[in-house]
Amino acid sequence: MTFPHDLLDDASILASFEGWSEDVYRDFFRLRSGEMTDEEFNEKYHWDRAILSMDMTGFTASAMRRGELQSFLRIMDAQRVAIPVLREFGAELVRCFADDIVALFKDANSALDAAFETHRRVRLFNDSPLSTDYPTQCCAGIGYGRVFAIGPNLAQGDEMNRASKLGEDIARANETLITERAFAAVSSRDDVHFEQQDQDDQLFPFYRATLRNE
C-alpha cells in the first residue's frame, strides 16, 4: 500500500519551518536513499558538548494569579540574570524559549559552575528590591557527551534529551541534576557533593549536585 497523500520532499521548504537547516535535510534524504552512510553523517555532525537546560518555576501559576504580562516579566528578569552568567562561564550558544534556557559548553565543569552561579544570582535578585511578589527560581539539568550539531540548539540526541528531562520535568527549584555521563566528567571535584537519585519512575540514572559550602 502506498501513502495516499502528498509528502513534502523539498529540503529548502522544510528548512523554512526552522526544524533543521537545508543542508541537514538534504543529508537526511541522502541518508534515507543510501547515498550517505550512518558513519558519514555521524562524522559530519557529531561533536562533544555539555548541555545546560534550565526551566523557571511557577510560570503557569504566576500567569493564573497575576496575569500573562506579569509572568512574561518574570521570565525576562530570569533571562536578565542568567544570560550574563552563562556568557561569563563560556557558553558557546544560549537560546531562550518561553521559560526555558538552553546553553552549550565545551566542558561539563563549566556547565556545572554556570548552573551553581545562576542559582546564586537568582537568589540574590529575588532578595533585592528589583524582585516581584512572585519571584522565579531555576531548575537545572546537565548532560555531557556526543550530540548532533543540528537544530536550533546545535545539540540533538540522547544527552540533550536527558538534560532537558532533568531540567524541565524532574529538577525542583534551586536544584541541579546531572546525567550519568556528566557525572563521570565532573565526579572528581572536591567542592561538589553528588548524590545518586532513586525514583520509582526513573527512566535513567542521574545525580543531584550541590556545592559543599552551601
Predicted features along the sequence, with ranges:
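Short beta-strand
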Residues: E92-C96, S131-D133, Q196-Q197
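Alpha-helical scaffold within the catalytic cores of cyclic-nucleotide enzymes
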Residues: I13, L73-G90, V102-A140, Y144, ...
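Catalytic-core segments of nucleotide cyclases and related cyclic-nucleotide turnover enzymes
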Residues: F148-A171
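Intrinsically disordered, glycine/charged-rich C-terminal tails and inter-domain linkers
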Residues: M1-E40, K44, A173-E214
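Short aromatic/hydrophobic contact patches that present stacked aromatics
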Residues: D100-V102, R208
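Conserved long alpha-helical elements within nucleotide-processing catalytic cores of c-di-GMP signaling
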Residues: T60-R80, V94-R95
